[in-house]
């Protein structure tokens, strides 16, 4: 049986959902007035439809900082970019929104989850502990769902 050691041991989407819920419940993430109207990149035509999209993006960015120490806004813009297609021209790769990613990093800094370093952003000890705690909860929930299936007798 595999033992939990860190965030890499859980499925990314499950962790992001759980951590987004944790950020929402904490109430520390300030929601800007432009959250309902902003596009997340030049390639997008509309603002995100999910009302909790900013919590999900914040959780995903926090996970990226956890996995990539020293990540910056430009790397996040590349990660959240997409194909831009004007229908009559060949599509091109575009960058995601710098403002959205920068704002979320600044909010995570205010919350004490990430800190600025020379090469970008890094996770704080408190941020790592907090994320590992949520990841462990996700791991336990997943283990509880999977274990009974393994132990069932075969007929």
Curated annotation (Swiss-Prot):
Keyword tags: Cytoplasm, Ribonucleoprotein, Ribosomal protein
Gene3D superfamilies (alphabetical): Winged helix-like DNA-binding domain superfamily/Winged helix DNA-binding domain
Compartments where found: Cytoplasm
A GO CC term attached to the entry: cytosolic small ribosomal subunit
A GO molecular-function annotation: structural constituent of ribosome
GO biological process: ribosomal small subunit assembly; translation
Record's subunit section: Component of the small ribosomal subunit.
Role of this protein: Component of the small ribosomal subunit. The ribosome is a large ribonucleoprotein complex responsible for the synthesis of proteins in the cell. Required for proper maturation of the small (40S) ribosomal subunit.
Protein family: Belongs to the eukaryotic ribosomal protein eS19 family.
Protein name: Small ribosomal subunit protein eS19
Organism: Entamoeba histolytica (strain ATCC 30459 / HM-1:IMSS / ABRM)
Organism taxonomic ancestry: Eukaryota, Amoebozoa, Evosea, Archamoebae, Mastigamoebida
């Amino acid at each position: 049986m595999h033992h939990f050691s860190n965030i890499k041991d859980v499925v990314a989407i499950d962790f992001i959902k759980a951590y987004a819920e944790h950020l929402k419940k904490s109430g520390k993430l300030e929601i800007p007035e432009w959250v309902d109207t902003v596009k997340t990149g030049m390639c997008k035509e509309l603002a995100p439809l999910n009302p909790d999209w900013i919590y999900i993006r914040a959780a995903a960015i926090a996970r990226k900082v956890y996995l990539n120490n020293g990540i910056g806004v430009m790397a996040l813009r590349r990660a959240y970019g997409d194909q831009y297609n004007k229908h009559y021209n060949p599509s091109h790769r575009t960058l995601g929104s710098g403002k959205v990613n920068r704002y979320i990093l600044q909010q995570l800094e205010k919350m004490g989850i990430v800190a600025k370093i020379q090469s970008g952003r890094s996770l704080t000890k408190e941020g790592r502990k907090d994320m590992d705690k949520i990841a462990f909860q996700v791991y336990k929930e997943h283990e509880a769902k999977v274990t009974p299936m393994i132990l069932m007798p075969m007929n």
